Amino acid sequence: TIMAEQGSTPSPSDAPPAPSGPPPKVTTLGRAAAPMASSNSDFTEVPEFEVFGLTVPLSSVCPEYLDILDVDMMKKPEEINKMQHHTSYYHSDFLIVRRGQEFQVNITFNRPYDSDRDKIAVEFVIGSSPSYSKGTYIPVFPTKERQSSWEGRIIDQSGNSVTMGITPSANCVVGKYHMFVAVATPFGIRRTRRDKSRDLYILFNPWSPDDAVFLNDETEREECVMTEMGIIYHGSYDDVSERNWNYGQFNYGVLDACLYIMDRANMPIVNRGDPIKVTRKASAMLNSRDDDGVLVGNWSGDYTFGVAPTSWTGSTDILLGYASSKMPVCYAQCWVYAAVFNTWSRIWPKFSLRCLGIPARVVTNYFSAHDNDGNLKTDIILDENGKIDRNRTRDSIWNYHCWNECYMSRPDLPAGFGGWQVVDATPQETSDGMYRCGPASVQAIKHGQICYPFDAAFVFAEVNSDVVFYSRRKDGTMDPVRVNHSHVGRMVLTKTPLKMTRRDITDQYKFPEGSTEERTVLEKAEEYGCEREKSEPPVADVDLVLPTMEISLGDDFEFEVEFINRSNQQRTVDAYVIGSVVYYTGVTSSEFLFDTPTVEIKPNMSKKELVEVESKSYMRDLVEQANLNFIVTGKVNETGQIVTAMKVVTLRNPKIMVEVSGPGKVNEEMMATVQFTNPFSFSLDGVYIRMEGPGVMLPKSKYYSMITGGSSLTWTEFFTPQRSGTTRVMVTLDCPALRQVSGQASITIQA
């Protein structure tokens, strides 16, 4: 005691003994009467008998009691339940229906059912510790005199059989339920035993006006819930490319995989009927940054221990791989996160989102601002001579960025902010301590109401940031020398409903550049803390124009810079032409070109400067997606003004050819043939080819250790279509030296 009072440090012998053995198990004991149910796979046994003071079987006391002989879930694809609930495409052994809409079950008794004296209930249970008050235990009664939150009625009665209609509430928990049929007698309650064949899935229902995800547009609904084939847009603003993707929300096991992901997230069962909470949790669980979620992000170019993001063709392998291994899947970039999330919502309704029934679509934002600290400025630092200072330039502009939109009402926001919501699973910044983003109302983003949850300010900056060029003096002070208001958020694309074409939805995110509405929106965003660049540096009287080019991988080419003098006096520009190999995120991998021409331009004239680019200068450092970024900056000697221009050039990859035998018919074998020729003088090592087709072919892959320069390969695969309609067979080729080679063949399958 004296030592402690004097501030001395106790000796080691005075310290308490170190704990030994395993740490105590963390439980809810002491703060909750029972643990919160957070697993759809957990189940509490429901007693077969609940006897009222009797200890003998009911049959010995009352031989005429009503007994259940059989329960038919009417779950075949051609039967009424799956047809009316739009779930016929799901490959599942169980009944799958949607909430807020009636489905039917047929019950056979040992004698005719008598509504006057027989009391029955169909019971639904989800998760452990089922509770009526929490909506995880729901009894459904056949008479109007007694109803619960789910409605029930007798549709038909014939002999000993009764067809009962059951309507789940439009806000019930979404997931896998267990079903029982219970009969009440004067002596107690007897119910059916647990039978897995009577389990059923209940999904969100965009066809029901009472459901929070109701979408009152049949074409949009068909595209965003039922369509398996997606198109993801990438490339650059003036050179848009397409990537096909199989969402696979109906494939066997995908729905269970999505439910497992929610279980892995420990999401309370009672929250799984709220699309706001489901999508927010999903955006966190799709990445593995802080919760061992589905996908590991990798932008390094080294994919040694996994699959390159450009190699995936669909969501099925990813979701099933995660569910079976219980480990994050390697690797992903933004479009993979968006595509797999889109499956969840269509599944969860595609957990990947379509699978669960939530209308969802993948959206691409061209020139997407990142790392801007929550303000509305993307800063590019130049030295006094107008040359870019890469050591001090921290912000980046992605050539494109993919996210998701999910359709739902937003009762937590003022009227008018429901509808499409941005949800982004790519791990960029934390939100409430986790890597997730959204749901953020698209309408709130367009109108600058970025105070509303969730993460609207971050998305607003992605589409509205100004690109500000600063000139840094030797003393460290910086002056804005040019502000570009229109570069970021140049175009926002998604797939046109039920067509294989693109749809420009930029006007859903922002008002026209320079309009009165746009100025009002930016002022509103400033009120909520988004800082803008207020200065308006004078516009230089010399313009720079960079060309739009189509260049194949491995080509030599000329890069042309046009200087336009719009003044009545001669101008001289000391220019810097810098070419870099960049990731699609705008991050520089290496610099392959540096030229410093001095250009003299006569009054009201233009002059072109040609720069030779040899393939050997960029090929050795090329990264996936083969992007070259050209930045031209300079200083006008006569005025001291700074001129700038930027251009991203995506090199064209060689083609891979896909041919499919035809005509195709359901359940008749077909053949797909892949052909590829290595156009280079060097060999391609470690080549993977992947192939799949929605409704016709499950994912397949083939490995080639080497394809020598100038040689060709042919791969033939047989498959049997399971569904009629128009679809595609998609193929990707991937190796360390060549990424993002793809091809596809459209086919129509007859019934």
Model-derived regions, located:
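Hydrophobic/aromatic-rich core segments of domains that either
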Residues: Q6-G7, W312-N464
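Contiguous beta-strand segments within globular domains
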Residues: K75-F124, S161-T163, V539, E550-E562, ...
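Extended acidic/polar, glycine-enriched regions
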Residues: D114-I231
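Short acidic/proline- and small/hydrophobic-mixed sequence motifs that coincide with surface turns
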Residues: S115-R117, Q569-V573, S681-G686
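Short glycine/proline/serine/threonine-rich loop/turn segments at secondary-structure transition edges
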Residues: A170-H178, S617-N629, Q722-M730
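Secondary-structure boundary elements
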Residues: S208-G357, R361
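Asparagine-centered strand-capping/turn motif at beta-strand->loop junctions
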Residues: F563-Q569, F676-F680
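Intrinsically disordered, low-complexity Pro/Gly/Ser/Thr-rich segments with frequent PxxP/GP/PP motifs
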Residues: S590-R620, L698-Q722
